[in-house]
């Protein structure tokens, strides 16, 4: 279970988060919507342990995420600005992920080759945004996460690939109890896949 209580974060006097509260039960698909500047990305960066809150708490199954390697190993994240090494290809990043995530499933990586038809040796920086997003999903799903944190996840994907990606995610939810938190501007799409949808405004939910 993801629990956020009274989360506050200020940047140069601006309250990006102003007492945000959130509860996401295990196996749920929770959608997050709101205008630009509402605090969605800032909230997700706290959930993945990138930011540390000024006050409040962020816990996964009762454990804080900040500087907690055990919790972070259970979380896969696809931010809008996905990180990759500049000279790396997909297979290079696979080796990197395999070293980071104890549950990385090599067999699943091979099977998902049928879904994501990408050149694994081509540098990721030479791929389109949509291809990079496919690579991010390919790797994230192979970490066998308990929690999947997604920021505008299918932006840049064609309609067919969007359906395939959501099918894979929802299969993990059904079979493994994966908990998903997804931020998007596309309310219609969230309504199609989410159990719950929360609206962020001025740093609050």
Name each model-derived stretch:
Residues 2, 9-201, 205:
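ABC transporter nucleotide-binding domains
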